[in-house]
Amino acid sequence: MENIINYIKWGIVSLGTLFTWIFGAWDIPLITLLVFIFLDYLTGVIKGCKSKELCSNIGLRGITKKGLILVVLLVAVMLDRLLDNGTWMFRTLIAYFYIMNEGISILENCAALGVPIPEKLKQALKQLNNKK
């Protein structure tokens, strides 16, 4: 039993190390983006359940979209590494872009579920939706 626990620990540490190597440092933009990706998917599933429109195809498209966000983030990381100036300029820029998009989607999902959204956020959503 102890061997199994050690293998699990080793696996978790290995995945964390691999993820850090691929995406760079565990900083606030990266953590925020990952949390927003999870929350957007979760609120989307809840919205689909409530509206009785939950579908595996839609869910798969959502997961694919989230995976492609990570691909774009990886491209930004590679550009930063290519520049070799010790900063995460492109990665941070891409992370902020997707944090904004995922945040808007989370708010839209919450509003569709009947969660009251502050008026200022509603106005910002309307302006951003008009620009799409």
Swiss-Prot record:
Pfam families: Phage_holin_4_1. Its main location: membrane. Signal peptide: none annotated. This is Uncharacterized 14.9 kDa protein in nagH 3'region. The chain crosses the membrane at residues 19-39, 58-78, 93-113. It comes from the Bacteria. It is a multi-pass membrane protein. Keywords: Cell membrane, Membrane, Transmembrane, Transmembrane helix. Belongs to the bacteriophage holin family. Cp-1 holin subfamily.
